[in-house]
Each structure stands twice: as C-alpha cells, then as structure tokens.
C-alpha cells in the first residue's frame, strides 16, 4: 500500500478575483476531511485577515481535484498516496518522502498546483473488526480471516475498491 501522508494542496492562482480576501476551503465527503478542513479554516481565520468560505463535503477525490484545477476552490487536504495513484496514475511507491517529492513535482508541472508541507500524520487503510469477534475467533492478523472470509461482509469506500493499493491490492496479497 502506498504511504498516505496528508497535506494541503492548493492553487497558485485565485479563481475568484472579485474577493481576494476570502479563501475557499473544500473537503471531501468523510469525517476526517471535515475535521482537517475546519482546522485549516480556523487557523486561517485566527492568524490572518482573510475570511474563509467553507465548501465542505464537496465530494470525492476527483471532484475536489477538478474544482481546484478550475479555480472554484483554493485548497483542500489531500493524501500523497491518493494523489500518486488516483490522480497521477502512478504505481505504488513505499517511501513517503519519495512519494511526496514525486507528487509535488508532478502536480506543479501538470496542473500548476502546489503541495504544502505534510500535516505530520500518516493515514493508511486498515481493517476493523469487533473486539468480541477478534477475541472469540483468535484473530490477530489479517491472514487469520482467510478461513472465514466467505462468511464476512466488508464495507469499503468507492475509492478504496478501485485503487490498485486498495481492495485490488488487498485481494492479491490475501487470496
């Protein structure tokens, strides 16, 4: 799986030149993104003279990326692994620093978009099961689920189901 550190990606050019004192912050359509976007909004409001137009729950990766390219938003939090694979269509890389460098360069060259410094945490996919089930069945690692996999029901985001480092990669490893 590709490392997925989170950082802000934003445009160099302000799309809405009517109001240069407003920063339009978007988020994807899940809780972690709402929290990150709100944190960015509050920091900007507290530390600058700028106002923030919150465009939270905008949609998935492609929707946010395209809105940023079109100048409809000014920034949103993105994950380097998502940028690498979902937007740039590059294969998995395992070194977080190399992923960040590659994504930063490609976004600048292809889209004139800048990646800022990482937020300082890594976000990777994992599986979660009820503790009671894990204890009762002695599940400690993912491979412990293989014998009962036909009886399990999993729920994944649409992006995880399609990304090579998501469900397809998971299936290759745990078939």
Regions found by a protein language model. Give the residues of each.
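Short, low-complexity disordered leader/linker segments with a strong preference
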Residues: 1-22
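Short, well-ordered beta-strand elements
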Residues: 18-32, 50-56, 150-155
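Short coil/turn segments
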Residues: 28-31, 131-135, 156-162
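Ligand-binding cleft/hinge of the Venus flytrap
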Residues: 40-48, 142-175
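Short helix-initiation/N-cap motifs at beta->coil->alpha
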Residues: 53-66, 158
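Alpha-to-beta junction loops
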Residues: 69-78, 149-152
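A ligand-binding cleft/hinge motif common to bilobed small-molecule-binding domains
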Residues: 77-92, 98-105
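A conserved helix-loop-strand patch within extracytoplasmic ligand-binding domains
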Residues: 99-154
């Amino acid at each position: 799986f590709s490392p997925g550190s989170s950082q802000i990606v934003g445009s160099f050019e302000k799309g809405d030149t009517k109001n240069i004192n407003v920063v339009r912050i978007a988020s994807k359509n899940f809780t972690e993104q709402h929290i990150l976007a709100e944190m960015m909004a509050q920091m900007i409001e507290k530390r600058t003279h700028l106002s923030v137009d919150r465009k939270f729950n905008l949609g998935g990766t492609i929707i946010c990326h395209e809105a940023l390219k079109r100048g409809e938003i000014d920034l949103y939090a993105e994950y380097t692994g998502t940028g690498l694979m979902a937007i740039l269509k590059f294969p998995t890389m395992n070194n977080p620093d190399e992923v960040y460098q590659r994504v930063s360069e490609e976004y600048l060259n292809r889209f004139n978009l800048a990646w800022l410094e990482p937020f300082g945490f890594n976000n990777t996919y994992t599986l979660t099961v009820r503790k009671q089930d894990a204890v009762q069945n002695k599940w400690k690692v993912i491979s412990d689920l293989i014998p009962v996999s036909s009886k399990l029901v999993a729920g994944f985001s649409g992006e995880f189901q399609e990304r090579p480092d998501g469900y397809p990669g998971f299936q290759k490893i745990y078939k």
